[in-house]
Amino acid sequence: MNKIKIAFLVFSLILLCTGCIEDKAVVEKNTAVFEESTINADSVSDYDIAAANNAFAFDMYSQLARRETGDHENVFFSPHSISASMAICYEGAEDTTKEQISNVFYFPSNKTVLKVRMERINDKINSVNSDYELQTANALWVQEGYPVKETYIHNVQKYYDGEVTNLDFAGKPDASRDTINEWVEARTNDKIKDLVPEDAITADARLIITNAVYFNGKWMYEFDKEMTGKKSFYPTKEEDISVDMMYTCNRFNYGETSKAKIIELPYRGNDLSMYVVLPKSNNIEKFETEFTLNDYTELKNDMEVVEEVKTTIPKFKFETKTELSNSLIEMGVVDAFGQADFSGISDSPLEISRVIHQAFIDVKEEGTEAAAATMEEMAMGVSISWDAKPKEFTADHPFMFFIEDGRTNCILFMGKVEYPEYEE
């Protein structure tokens, strides 16, 4: 029997199948009434979804940072988006397929624990705040006539707030592609375009799961546009390029070790921040292979509120579109791409065929837009440094950055700037 192919596009997950199609959309009825798995409430609270998300973020970064050429490569992705999409897929996974996804994404074996925590964290992320825009959205697109289990549909709608829509992939692939891409564009302020490529929806397509994350925020302390000017940036010790560098001097959470400096640049509303990690040595390739989640956490925890930090970082704007299938296989999600068991979704066999992730970021004087506030005190600092000498944070060589939600402690976006460019 042929297996249904799952093309996983993050922000979109596509499940492809070769099973037969009936004239009307079919929802497989379960004889049992919907019953949530019986779990101890403590098991939900004990599962640290932020720790799982952040551990996966560093694992995926290690894959994306691998150099296939000698060219400078910026990195940007949303670990939360990838995890959220795979969580919806995980909801229907069984046996070794489920186990492997769990191991790579640090998901709990109890699916109810995961979906309850996902529901709670998405509620926090999507809570309205007039100081910034942050939203995440899920959708399940089903081939007309393809049988999907009622329990699965119920869980996607209830716990992941997923929209469920029937489309005719087989008869109208182009129209279906346009509909899905328009959905993604609408939820990312038109920043993510053409996520689903022309060759993605074939005659075998049966299910598409999409997740979109969008953030647009202004700095708590904006950079002065009049201070922005062309300055040197050094992609390597031997290279020197001229880029637009922004400058500000203000009170920030700041820290450093013998290997790196870190600064927290908060956004208005004080819920989200960008953390910039600058290696002291201009050797990003060596630094990123040694820099772990524990190192990052310790660096953040050791920050102090410094009254005056002279901060210089480049403006940058770029978009990435990456095939993640091989990376996930190397990380351990093997069976899902071949001998898969997604029987929790449908009795028709399914497997993942491809994974594509697309993300966009724009960092400028006013703030950050990623598709992927004025306050007197900082949320992060434990102590205050009264050193009369100002600290300097000059990001004139490659650095890593993280956009975190302080309410959930989740890394929503993660990346590396190795060659900053900015086009209006």
Swiss-Prot record:
Kindly give the SUPFAM superfamilies that the UniProt entry links to this protein: Serpins (SSF56574)
As one GO molecular function, the record gives: serine-type endopeptidase inhibitor activity
Q: Which residues form a coiled coil?
A: none
Record keywords: Transmembrane included?
no
**Which keywords does the record carry?**
Protease inhibitor, Serine protease inhibitor
A cellular component term from Gene Ontology for this protein is:
extracellular space
Signal peptide span = none
Gene3D superfamilies according to UniProt: Alpha-1-antitrypsin, domain 1, Antithrombin, subunit I, domain 2
Which residue positions does UniProt flag as site: Reactive bond? G381, V382
Q: Which PANTHER family match?
A: GH10112P-RELATED, SERINE PROTEASE INHIBITOR, SERPIN
Instruction: Please report which protein family the annotation says this sequence is part of.
Output: Belongs to the serpin family.
Report the protein name in the record. Uncharacterized serpin-like protein MA_3388
